[in-house]
Amino acid sequence: MSFEELWQKNPMLKPRIEKVVVNFGVGESGDRLTKGAQVIEELTGQKPIRTRAKQTNPSFGIRKKLPIGLKVTLRGKKAEEFLKNAFEAFQKEGKKLYDYSFDDYGNFSFGIHEHIDFPGQKYDPMIGIFGMDVCVTLERPGFRVKRRKRCRAKIPRRHRLTREEAIEFIEKTFGVKVERVLLEEEEETQ
């Protein structure tokens, strides 16, 4: 039985996107950080928060607690719309999504080198070019039991997402081809 048939038989097993976190690692504060904030707000439609340096590094001119990056957390429809555009920009760069980008619980990450690859974005010499990391967290309905305040419980192993299931969900939902490298190596060793 394929995952698609299983999801139709029991809709509580169908994965969904919990959140998408977009991270801009600018590496410096000041004017470049404010320009990055404009770009990320234009791409996501949400105001970013500033991430701060954890350590002082004099060779890079970074002091502890100095804002050096930006991040935005997207949920629901905004997350799905952004992810469609992000996959389009990712494939426009000629990159492929590999199965080793997925962890054992179905979460995955990928990077985009230039924000101008997004649909509707043009190069502006005053702003420059920014890259970003996109981290996607997947879950099933019922995962709230591990986060709620009262009667908190663990998610049983049978209800957790697997790497293969997450790959199939992304391929079916967004039409992205995932190159299988890890799965082929595991089959060869057995």
Swiss-Prot record:
GO biological process: translation
Entry keyword set: Ribonucleoprotein, Ribosomal protein, RNA-binding, rRNA-binding, tRNA-binding
GO CC entries: cytosolic large ribosomal subunit
Keyword Lipid metabolism: no
Entry keyword Ribosomal protein: yes
Membrane-spanning intervals of the chain: none
Function: This is one of the proteins that bind and probably mediate the attachment of the 5S RNA into the large ribosomal subunit, where it forms part of the central protuberance. In the 70S ribosome it contacts protein S13 of the 30S subunit (bridge B1b), connecting the 2 subunits; this bridge is implicated in subunit movement. May contact the P site tRNA; the 5S rRNA and some of its associated proteins might help stabilize positioning of ribosome-bound tRNAs.
Assembly notes: Part of the 50S ribosomal subunit; contacts the 5S rRNA and probably tRNA. Forms a bridge to the 30S subunit in the 70S ribosome.
Protein name as annotated: Large ribosomal subunit protein uL5
Lineage of origin: Archaea, Methanobacteriati, Methanobacteriota, Methanomada group, Methanococci
Gene: rpl5
